[in-house]
Amino acid sequence: MNQELRIRLESYDHRLLDDTVKTIVDISNSTGSKLRGPIPLPTKKEIFTILRSPHVNKSSREQFERRTHKRLIILENPQPKTMEALKRLSVPFGVEVTFKI
């Protein structure tokens, strides 16, 4: 039976995301699971525009942006040791991790 575990990571800070990806890759390599990735997924860019003045001057606006960086890691036939190590993985705040089998 061929199983694969998809690990999707999202974060606003790409450095935190890359550190977490490196940790997962190290866990996978040390436990002997076959790994595909990390695959960089498209970055979602959201732009917010607000008025600078509360009353007039609609032409005076300020723009802010928020970028959501994403990565995908695929483990093929994950070993039980790999699954246990991933359960114990401490993920920093600001990184969202989703597992799919």
Swiss-Prot record:
A GO term (biological process) for this protein?
Answer: translation
The question of whether Ribonucleoprotein is a record keyword is answered with yes
**Pfam families xref list:** Ribosomal_S10
Keyword line:
Ribonucleoprotein, Ribosomal protein
Which stretches are transmembrane?
none
Q: List the disulfide bonds.
A: none
Entry's Gene Ontology cellular component terms: ribonucleoprotein complex; ribosome
Do you know which Gene3D superfamilies this protein is assigned to? Ribosomal protein S10 domain
Per its record, what are the GO molecular function terms? structural constituent of ribosome; tRNA binding
**Protein role:** Involved in the binding of tRNA to the ribosomes.
Q: How does it assemble?
A: Part of the 30S ribosomal subunit.
| Similarity-based family | Belongs to the universal ribosomal protein uS10 family.
Q: Quote the PANTHER family the UniProt record gives.
A: 30S RIBOSOMAL PROTEIN S10 FAMILY MEMBER
What's the protein name? Small ribosomal subunit protein uS10
Query: Which species is this UniProt entry from?
Result: Ureaplasma urealyticum serovar 10 (strain ATCC 33699 / Western)
This protein's encoding gene? rpsJ
